[in-house]
Structures are given as structure tokens and as C-alpha cells.
Amino acid sequence: MTPKPNTTSPTNNLPLLSKDSPDIESLLILNPKVQDKANAVPSAVTKKNKHNWKRNEEKGCGSTCGESKLKNDFRDIKHTTLSERGALKEAMRCLKCADAPCQKSCPTQLDVKSFITSISNKNYYGAARQILSDNPLGLTCGMICPTSDLCVGSCNLQASEEGAINIGGLQQYACDVFKQMNVRQIVSKEVRENRNASHKEQVALIGCGPASISCASFLARLGYTDITIYEKRAYIGGLSSAEIPQFRLPYDVVDFEIQLARDIGVQIETNRPLGKDGLTLAKLKEQGAAAVFIGIGNPEPKIDPLFEGLTIENGFYTSKNYLPAVAAASKPGMCGCKRTPLPTMRGRVVVLGAGDTAMDCATSALRCGASRVTIAFRKGFTGIRAVPEEMEAAKEEKCEFLPFSAPRKINVKDGRIVSIEFNKTEQDDNGKWYEDEEQIVILKCDYVISAFGSTLKEDAVLSALQPCQLNKWGGIEVDSTTQQTSEKWVFAGGDVAGVAETTVESVNDGKIAAWNMHRYIQSLHGNQVSETPELPQFFTPIDEVDISVDMCGVKFENPFGLASAPPTTSGPMCRRAFEQGWGFILTKTYGLDKDLVTNVSPRIVRGSTSGPLYGPNQGSFMNIELISEKSCEYWLQCIRELKRDHPTKIVIASIMCVYNKADWIELATKSEEAGADILELNLSCPHGMGEKGMGLACGQSPEIVKEICRWVRACVKIPFFPKMTPNITDVREIARAARDGGASGVTATNTVSSLMHMKADGNAWPAIGSTKRTTYGGMSGSAIRPIAMKAVSSIANELDGFPIMATGGIESAETGLGFLMAGASVLQVCSAVQNQDFTVVDDYCTGLKALLYLSGAESLKNWDGQSPPIEKHQKGKPILLQGQKKMPFFGKYRDEREKLEAIKLSESNLLDTENYHFASRPDTQVSRVPTVEDVIGKALPRIGPYVTLDNQEQKVAIIDDDMCINCGKCYMTCNDSGYQAITFDPVTHQPHVTEDDCTGCTLCYSVCPIPECIEMVPRTGPWKAPKRGVKPSVEPGTPKVVKVDQRGRVILDTTGGMQ
């Protein structure tokens, strides 16, 4: 037998201090332990146990039994829906490819790479702006696009094990956050100032569906001021409102996108059908319309002659009367009704068709009470036209599928449908399909919904479309490259034009039509317009925010520039950077020709700080690259050319010399004469150059730094900034020496000296030559951001008002704003470009504008930058039942929760708008937008020495059971790295914080995978002294801080006074 361990001290019979007490041992029962034996549990037991933990559907019964559990449940069903956490994780996974195939596969040509880059940088406005610039219905399309057949189908990550990016979900998330910002669209200043008489021409659009909304939006962005959409229904949105179910596309989304169009002058008139009340093409032209767009869809259903005479009273629907009836009863805000009953669907429903509409009919039927839904179609599963996303949704909701079935007869008894008969379909060896009347299937049913497509056949409408020519299928004859009809002034798009089969293709029809309508209208005024579309982008007041900044009398268009690094290896690279929008560049550090270098290779490697993460978004790089290999005259000439061609951009010459007065004077003078706006003195290169008596060899000595600064100050008039090294005990000493030597400011900081990869055979990476030697290199990237942030803030606090150029881990507008608030004036970027390309600057500029604008909005004070408050959710979707103790989201608890949810849904009013965010005008009001100068140093008053912190305002952790996914990470870290203050229920796996034991260390909060599932809240009750283990001879208090001087030094009261 294993001897029982001692629990008391052999000397004084007291409990062992180095052993957990019995209550802690009980708490640790589920804490991981190293296993020294294999596990063995009978399968009969594991088969039973697994049901206690399942989060997915049980396999087995393939259909619903009795009334559908989905009745009245119009909550979001999309697997693509994301929370902020999910969106950031997915966006970080994106490769942001060159010549991205996802964009090529998008009908509207969305710049997918760019908007996902913005999402990964938490610039949701920038992402939404990119999306809405190319697709005014970006939120709708993010929700319902058949992405597997479009962008996602072309994603290069399809070639990897982890699979393609959830592009639709990311698009939905970014646009939804912008929707919550409630910022109006405006016409850009450039367009407003260039309007002429042609922009007053009257434009009419018929039908308020996706194609018309898109067309009208682009025409308004082009500057047209008299745009009217005529809609036959009492509500707007077309098919998006009437036929796409609420659980896929909520009405508040449609309302939001139409409000954006109204913001820029688009007028909408409802109850104006084509063919009635004088609304015809001829009348519109008589009334002064210069151009007309037809976007009426295909309003009539295709009905098999088999169903002639059948009505709703018999139990027969078409998709064209069923889905609008469901929408009217389930889409809050659509028609202004307070309560409208859903179509009754008790019993068995058969849906005919295999397209997306058929799947919508089937899943809607379950929500109307159907006990069983069968989708019957003529061909096999391989011939289903519905996109995989739609079919999988129907399958998951237990719809049945009946392939190879063509309806032959509907049986009616006492005026109600009782069954439907099918012939089996076959395909011969030549690929021709036929019906085999010898193989008959009779399916009992109570309702039949026909979803065999739609057409345009109403005589009044066809008459109103004259003189437009019709094609042989009865649709409008349209030029598919311009959307122009046989009449030059009439254009058409969407279903009625015959090419578009999806919402996004309809949107694109409207987009193409808008440009060609613009060309046509301009031609009437004798103005020539390019055949290649030049459509204005989406624009809001955010885009008018000024992010320029003055530093040392030099005006920067924006605070983002390229550091002296690989992105500025050559003059042409610097020029391209300016063309993409960077506010300034630093040349690659150059010296006199006598100090020219030759680099080794390999020399720039991915860091080890990101673990096994390959591809973009590396947390760090390590380089052993030296300064520029190009001559001094090369760089002087490049500076001359860049300043000549880009006079408003700022060129900063990065220079380096040995510790020699004549050399510094010569190089600084030549650089100033070439036209450099500012000099940066590279006194901090951490590898290679120090061994030559340059770089770090100069920058670690305050005396040398001060003297070099004096030499340069004496010979140039332009500002200069010595570049600080982080490889020193106190960077403030070097900064102070630079200031005392006459420097205009400093750059903080250079890379951190490091050694990255060590392989199993003892070789490091990078390994040079046949001997595989290596050296210490400079680490850059987000991994050094905390070091750089500390350097910037400490210098700013030490030298009040001293200008600082920050560098080190700046990779977004948000991180850049952090450096500005820590005291920096402008921001240098390197590793973020190495991870991506020069175009990231557009994301940084829009992101900074948005951050400044939103900070001035009182109504958004509870936002964290561009991140809205986190609502309680599971899988990115709101929780219907909140505060249900002891009821996690798995096993039997999941079943119990679903039953309670069904009860609540059955009692709810589906048309209640309370839980939806509808667009409101006036939009978010901003009192004053801060400038960049306003935010510089804003955080400094709250950054200081440790002894200024109050150790009696304690906080403790609290865990939200509604958001918890029961992983136990908080429990484990508290046990093995903290204070054993969290219990973990063995049955529900719900963690709970014991407040008396919690010290507020925040480890649990830090490792929790769900943001804000754990919150740090003030401790209740009076302050309690820490558990000392053994009672101290004296219980210390907190020293009183008498004074904190400007250099951060703390003066304490040492007379014994304690707080």
C-alpha cells in the first residue's frame, strides 16, 4: 500500500504550509494531472456518457415528430454569423493574397483582401466602407450571398487543410457594426463641387429591389439630384423583404441600406405599380425622365398546368404568395403591422423545386407549424440548384428530400389536398430526362408549395414596358454588358434582365447600369465619359476628418510613414509608397561611400514569438540586415526627385556615420541640400554596424549621442531626430542627451537585439554559409510594441512636449492611436508592410479618422474604439433565455433550454421591433471631432511609477454563465498559477469565483477564450489584507506618496505614516 502522506508538521503538529488544505484538494479534483496509466472505460458507459456533453444534434430520428420545435422561431440560423471574437480570428487567418481570386469571383468585385485586412485591424468602418463602395447592399449580401459558389469557392485557402475563409460572415460583421454606428452616407465634396446642369436630370427607377437600390445609390454618388424609385408594394426592398425569410435576412438590414440611399437624395414612392395609375415608360418620359431603370424582378410564379384551379383554401401555395405571407407576419418594421398571423401549416408539407427559393419555403414551413416537410425535385442530389448553404440548412432542420420525382397529380378530398402523386424520373444514356409512368410514388400531405421559378407575363406590365423589345422568353431584351434595352434611355437589371440569378448579381446589374446611364445622360449634354467605370466610393462625414499633424513646423498629411527598413530599400519603393497614401517615408539608412556595406543572406526571418503560425500576421521578424547597400549619391538624387514630384509629402533622410565630426557634418549637410525635410540619425542599429563603430556603438553612450547631436545641429537648419535603442537600461538618459545636444526630437525605438530560432540539431536560423553561423539580430513587429510603447511614454513623461517619432509594432490605426496617446507625434511602420503591402496605409487612415470621429459621439461613449459593447451571445448570436443558472448549452441542459425557448417564442410577438437596430435620423451626433494634436499624450497623466497605484481599490473576477463555453481555462490557470479561487462543477462544468479567495490578479480574464465572459468588478465590502500565510510581526500599510516629480521620481513619506 502507498503510505499515507503527512499532513502535519513533525515539529509542532500544525498543518503543513507547503501542502494544500483539504478544501483546496477538493477544489482541485478536476485539475489536470500527469497520467501514468492508460484510461479504460467500457463502451457501454461512454455511449451513455457522451449524451451528457453533446453540443450538436443527436443522430437518429430523421424527421420532426408532432409539431415542429422551430415554430415561431425566426432567429438567425446562419452558420456564417460571427461575433467580434470570431470575426477577428477568421480575419487573421486570411492570407490577403495578391491578385486575389476571391475578388475576381465576386460579381460586384469587392476588394475582399482589403476589407478583411481592415477587420483584422479592428477598423470596422474601413471594412464597411470598402464593401459598400462596391456593393451598396453589402450587409444583405454578406448574409445571403451563395459564397461557396462565388468568393469562397475561389479562396486560396481551399488548398489548405483548414479550408476557405468565411467571407460572407466577415462582410456581415463589418457592415453590421457600421450599421450600429448609425452614421449617414453623404456625397463626396469632390462630386458636390463638380455638379452641373446634367446632374439635375430626372431619373426614374421602377421596383425597389436590390438592382434599383444599387443603381440609385451609384447615380446619387455620381451627383444626380432628382432620383425616384417607384415601388408597387406598400413596403420597400423587393424580393429581399418579401421572399427571403427573416431568419436569413432581417428587415432592419434592408431598411438600413435603403436609408443610406435616402441619405444622398434618393426618393421612394410606394404603392406605384407599373401599368396602373399612369406609371408606364411612355408617361415617365413625358414627365421628363431622362433615363429609366427597370428592376421589377419576375413577379409571377411559373405554375404547372397540373395545379390550375388550386388555391390557398385547398392547401396550395406558390413561393410568390407563400413567402410574402410569411414575411408580413415575421418581419418587424416591414409593413407597420403590430401583429399578423403566420400562414397555418399543420401537418405535412411538400415543397416542389430544388432551388434556393424551395429551401426557403421548406424551412419557413417548419416555422409555420408543419410537422414534416418533404422537398421533392425532378433530378438527383447532384442536380440540385440550391447552393450548399441553403440545402444544408434544410437538412439540419430535418426536412426530407425526395429526388427523381415529377408531380403527376394532386388528390383533393373535401376541398383539401390529401396527397400528391409523382412519376419517377430517369435519365437515358444520352443525358435526356424523362418520366417513367410505371414508377409512381404517392405522398400523403396537407399542403403543397410550388417553387418552380418565376416569370414576367402580366399583360398590364408588358404593355407598360413598351416600346422596349422583349426576347423569345418573354423578358426584356437587354445588352448584358451595359444593361441597356432596345431604347437607349431605358436600362434594366436583376431577374427581369435575364442574367442575374442572385441578389449580388442583381446589385451588380444596378451598378453597371448606373455607369452607363451616367454616360447616356452626359452625352445628352455633350460631355464625354470614359467607357471604363469610375464610380465614386462610399462616403460619410468620417471621411472628412482631418488627420494631418504638425511636428517641428513640418506638416504631415497623415501621421503614418514608412520606417527606415526593407520597405524603403529603393527610391522607386518610396515613390510607390507615396502614391498609395503614406504621409512620409524614411530612406533606408545610408552613409558615406567609404562606409558601404554588403549584406549576408538569408537575413530576414519570421519570429518565433508567433509559434507555429505561418503566412501573414507574424507577430515578429528578426533581421540581420545592415544599412543600405546603395551609394550616398543614389539616395541624395532620390530625395531630390521625390521632393520635386511629391512636394506635400515628407521625406526623412536616415543617415549613419562613425563617431567622426567631419563625416556627420558632410552627410548631414548633403542630405539637407538634397531637400530632405527632416534627418533621422541612426544611432541604434543593433547588429553588424556596431562592430564597425556605427549605430549601436554610438547610441548607447549619452555623451556620444549628445556630441553627435551638437555636430549636426551646428551644420543644418532642418529638424533632426536621433533614433533611440531599446537595448539599454534607461532610454530616457539617451533622449535627454539628444535634447541637450540640440536634437529636435527622437525616434523610439529601433529593433530589439535577439536570437530567434534554434533547431533540434543545434543550428540557428538564419544560418549563413556552409558553416551555418549566425549572430544576434534585431526583432521587430508587434512583439516589441510593449517595449516601444514604454520607451515612448517614458520619454514623453520625462521630456514634456519633446517630439517623438514612434516605431515598433505599429500595425493598425488602433495601435497607432495608442502610441499617439502615449506621446508620439507621428508613426513609423515596417513589419506590418512586410506582413502585407503598401496599401495598408488606406486602412490606417480610415481607421484613425473613424476612431477620432466616434470618440466625439456621446451616444457611443460605451464603445471601445470601433468595437461596440459585447452583448451576451453563443456562437455570435444573441441568447434568448438569459440568467438561467445551472443550465449550460450542452447535453440534457441544451434540450431543456430548447423547450423553454420554444415556450417563450410561442408567446412572443414576431413583429416586435424592440430587439432590432433600425436606422434612425438624425444619425449619430458628434459634438467635436478631436484632432491628432488633441490626442497626443492624452494617456500620459495616467502612466507613472508603481507606488502611485492604489492597492486598496481591489477588483475581483465574475464569470457570466450565459457566455461561458465551459472550457475551464480560468479554473486551471487559477489553480496552477494563481490563488485556487475558482470552483468547477463536475456536472455542468460551470466555473464560479469565490470572492473571498479572489485577489483580482486577472489571469482568468486573460486566458478566457470568450471576450467579456469574465469581467473584473469592484470587490464588495471593505478592503481586506492579503492572506500572509504566517502572521507577520508587523502588518504594513501603504506608504503615502508625497510628490511625483516631472521625471517620474517618487518622494515617499518615510516617517512611518501609512494609509
UniProtKB/Swiss-Prot annotation:
The encoding gene: dpyd-1
Assigned EC number: 1.3.1.2
Anything else known: Worms lacking dpyd-1 exhibit increased sensitivity (decreased survival) to the chemotherapeutic drug 5-fluorouracil.
Binding site for FAD: 207-211, 231-239, 248, 274, 494-503
Protein's recorded name: Dihydropyrimidine dehydrogenase [NADP(+)]
Gene Ontology biological process: beta-alanine biosynthetic process; thymidine catabolic process; thymine catabolic process; uracil catabolic process
Entry similarity comment: Belongs to the dihydropyrimidine dehydrogenase family.
Taxonomic placement: Eukaryota, Metazoa, Ecdysozoa, Nematoda, Chromadorea
Residues annotated as binding [4Fe-4S] cluster 3: C964, C967, C970, C974
InterPro entries, per the entry: 4Fe4S_Fe-S-bd, 4Fe4S_Fe_S_CS, Aldolase_TIM, Dihydroorotate_DH_cat, DPD_II, FAD/NAD-bd_sf, FAD/NAD-binding_dom, Helical_ferredxn
Gene Ontology CC terms, in alphabetical order: cytoplasm; cytosol
Start and end residues of each 4Fe-4S ferredoxin-type domain: 84-118, 955-987, 989-1019
Entry-linked PANTHER family: DIHYDROPYRIMIDINE DEHYDROGENASE [NADP(+)] (PTHR43073:SF2)
Cofactor or coenzyme needed: [4Fe-4S] cluster; FAD; FMN
Gene3D superfamilies linked to this entry: 3.30.70.20, Aldolase class I, Alpha-helical ferredoxin, FAD/NAD(P)-binding domain
Reaction it catalyzes: 5,6-dihydrouracil + NADP(+) = uracil + NADPH + H(+)
Residue sites binding FMN per the record: S564, K588, T589, K723, G781, T807, G808, G809, C830, S831
Residues annotated to bind substrate: N623, N682, L683, S684, N750, T751
Gene Ontology molecular-function annotations: 4 iron, 4 sulfur cluster binding; dihydropyrimidine dehydrogenase (NADP+) activity; metal ion binding; NADP binding; uracil binding
